[in-house]
Regions:
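Alpha-helical interface subdomain recognition
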Residues: 2-142
């Protein structure tokens, strides 16, 4: 079951990366009041937060996949860490992406709404973030 959890974590990471890229491209293209909205500091801060969360997720997913290759005894613990972190991050990035797109974020005109829906479904597959946080805590002795 842990290999499936690691695989869905990798898929979710890919979705989060693509949703982030779509959002950043939109911020660079969309103009409001004659100014690219990507120049607004509040949106830059939100994008920077998404970027840092994605970098953490990359490390978690790579570590979980490495555990399988190394046949480590830490597989369940590290996989739960990855699934919890990536689930929360995909949730965050899909929410932020739709917010930054405004009303068109949930229309068929832009794909960002599809990532929002996929994030919600993938988060529940093989245990949600809460399940994996609890599992991680149990496996580390808390």
């Amino acid at each position: 079951m842990d290999i499936a959890r690691a695989a869905i974590s990798a898929e979710m990471l890919g979705g989060a990366l693509e949703a982030f890229e779509i959002t950043v491209n939109y911020l660079k293209e969309r103009e409001q009041f004659g100014v690219k909205i990507g120049s607004f500091q509040a949106l830059q801060h939100r994008a920077a937060n998404m970027f840092t969360e994605l970098e953490l997720c990359k490390s978690c997913v790579l570590e979980s996949l490495s555990c399988f290759e190394e046949k480590s005894n830490d597989v369940p613990r590290i996989v739960s860490l990855a699934k919890a972190k990536v689930g929360e991050t995909f949730h965050l990035i899909s929410n932020e992406g739709v917010q930054m797109h405004g009303g068109v974020g949930v229309t068929d005109e832009y794909d960002i709404g599809l990532y929002l829906k996929r994030a919600r479904v993938a988060e529940q597959i093989f245990g949600n973030s809460e399940f994996h946080r609890n599992r991680y805590a149990e496996l580390t002795g808390y």
